[in-house]
């Protein structure tokens, strides 16, 4: 019989087969109904609902909390009332005890948890404590802080992230010979959180009995501060250091927080020395975290540091196509975009995968099933209000200067009548960039390139569009110039 995530499941037929009485799950259900009413949804959901009812080593019934902090709160604030309600509802007088998960396992608590159809008590569950993987092998609940959509199946690997992806896969498989700790770093929106979530899900799937703790650095800070205020730091340490795999997202947030850095340093040291796995993410490499404690920074550098690079164009298109498939499953529309729309999104949103996916979400929300019929002009109109705030306005003159500098030529050459390839190809690239990065019409672009007509510009745009798919050098040139222009 189990209570997990606010749902009670009961079947004590094996543990209490000789006792003609109400199943323990039914009794606990009655207790929880009263406690929820008396404590309120927030307190009940935070402290009581995450508990698990287990059979103790001597046949008693034990309320097992996921953390020592939760155990101490229940003992201090609610245990007297819990005991009263249990006694009043259990006619056979079964003894009820309270232990944290580590306590229960250390005294040889039964690993048996009987299962049956659940008696539902749907309650809000707090995520203020570190999230532990369930010991019964069931899929963890989203309230643990993990997002179900972030898995290896939905992660799109490419040159920018394939090494980090391979490392995450290896850690999740519990393979021997891993580096420890592992730190993934890269700017906001590069896929770090997705990778860490995927790693956690896969690690729990591969080894259901292992203990996995996933939390953000902000959660680490807030939980540690609360533990200090409640004088529960020992319980806090107990929970983190009992993990087989500890994952902390955005560890750079801890920099400058002296006591929290100290605690993380000792936790990291203890876990690594004990052969447990530790994984972090941050927005920069350890060497660049100058405000972080030197000892902690050194430990973060001591394992394997994996950088995630900006997604290249092919990877961005792959991400868009995978996202389209997900949207089609959710909403039932045809998972396609016009080629010019797909290319526009991949070329326009180059700095962050989140921005890229956000643009597609916006189109889906606005157009619904009609998203596959949107023209480039309609897409540009829809996304115009959603472009990055304060983005630098790029002019055709900016494009001409950046292109000529990149190719080592004079800007005046782009405006000349010269047609040799060394000049014609950069000129076509600059025209293509002008079409992508400005709102100027084709005739206007032509006028600013030495008075050419719009058909010349259209030919240049189509030529570059066709070439860059098969010419990685040209594709990289366009990306480099674009990044320089956007600064």
Curated annotation (Swiss-Prot):
ATP binds at residues 189, 191-193. Residues 1-92 are annotated as: Domain I, interacts with DnaA modulators. InterPro entries: AAA+_ATPase, Chromosome_initiator_DnaA, Chromosome_initiator_DnaA-like, Chromosome_initiator_DnaA_CS, DnaA_C, DnaA_dom, DnaA_N_dom, DnaA_N_sf. Its main location: cytoplasm. The keyword Cell division does not apply. Residues 92-144 are annotated as: Domain II. Belongs to the DnaA family. PANTHER family: CHROMOSOMAL REPLICATION INITIATOR PROTEIN DNAA. Oligomerizes as a right-handed, spiral filament on DNA at oriC. Plays an essential role in the initiation and regulation of chromosomal replication. ATP-DnaA binds to the origin of replication (oriC) to initiate formation of the DNA replication initiation complex once per cell cycle. Binds the DnaA box (a 9 base pair repeat at the origin) and separates the double-stranded (ds)DNA. Forms a right-handed helical filament on oriC DNA; dsDNA binds to the exterior of the filament while single-stranded (ss)DNA is stabiized in the filament's interior. Domain I is involved in oligomerization and binding regulators, domain II is flexibile and of varying length in different bacteria, domain III forms the AAA+ region, while domain IV binds dsDNA. This is Chromosomal replication initiator protein DnaA. The gene is dnaA.
């Amino acid at each position: 019989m189990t209570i997990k995530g606010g749902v009670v499941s009961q079947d004590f037929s094996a543990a209490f087969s000789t006792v003609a009485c109400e199943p323990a799950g039914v009794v606990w259900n009655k207790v929880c109904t009263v406690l929820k009413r008396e404590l309120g949804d927030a307190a009940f959901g935070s402290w009581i609902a995450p508990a698990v009812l287990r059979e103790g080593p001597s046949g008693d019934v034990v309320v097992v909390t996921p953390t020592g902090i939760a155990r101490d709160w229940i003992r201090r604030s609610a245990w007297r009332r819990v005991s009263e309600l249990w006694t009043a509802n259990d006619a056979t007088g079964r003894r009820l005890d309270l232990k944290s998960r580590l306590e229960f396992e250390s005294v040889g608590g039964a690993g048996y948890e009987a299962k049956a159809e659940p008696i539902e008590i749907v309650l809000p569950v707090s995520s203020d404590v570190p999230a532990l993987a369930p010991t019964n092998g069931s899929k963890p609940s989203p309230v643990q802080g993990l997002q179900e959509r972030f898995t290896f199946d939905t992660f799109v690997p490419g040159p920018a992230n394939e090494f980090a992806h391979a490392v995450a896969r290896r850690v999740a498989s519990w393979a021997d010979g891993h580096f420890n700790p592992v730190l993934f770093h890269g700017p906001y929106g590069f896929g770090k959180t997705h990778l860490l979530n995927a790693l956690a899900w896969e690690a729990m799937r591969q080894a259901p009995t292992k203990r996995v703790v996933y939390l953000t650095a902000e959660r680490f800070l807030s939980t540690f501060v609360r533990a200090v205020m409640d004088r529960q730091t020992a319980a806090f340490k107990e929970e983190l250091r009992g993990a087989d795999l500890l994952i902390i997202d955005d560890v750079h947030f801890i920099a400058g927080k002296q006591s929290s850095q100290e605690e993380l340093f000792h936790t990291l040291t203890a876990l690594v020395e004990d052969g447990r796995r530790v994984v972090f993410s941050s927005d920069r490499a350890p060497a660049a975290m100058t405000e972080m404690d030197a000892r902690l920074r050194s430990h973060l550098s001591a394992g394997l540091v994996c950088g995630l690079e900006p997604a290249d164009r092919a990877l961005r298109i792959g991400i868009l196509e995978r996202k389209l498939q997900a949207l089609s499953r959710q909403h039932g529309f045809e998972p396609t975009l016009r080629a010019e729309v797909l290319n526009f999104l991949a070329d326009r949103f180059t700095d962050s995968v989140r921005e890229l996916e956000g643009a597609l979400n916006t189109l889906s929300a606005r157009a619904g099933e009609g998203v596959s019929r949107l023209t480039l002009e309609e897409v540009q109109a829809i996304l115009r209000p959603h472009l990055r705030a304060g983005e630098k306005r790029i002019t055709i003159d900016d494009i001409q200067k950046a292109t000529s500098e990149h190719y080592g030529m004079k800007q005046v050459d782009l405006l000349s009548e010269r047609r040799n390839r060394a000049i014609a190809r950069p000129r076509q690239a600059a025209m293509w960039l002008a079409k992508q990065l400005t709102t100027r019409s084709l005739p206007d672009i032509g006028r600013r390139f030495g008075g050419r007509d719009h058909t010349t510009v259209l030919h240049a745009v189509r030529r570059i569009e066709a070439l860059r798919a098969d010419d990685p050098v040209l594709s990289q040139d366009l990306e480099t110039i674009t990044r320089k222009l956007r600064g």
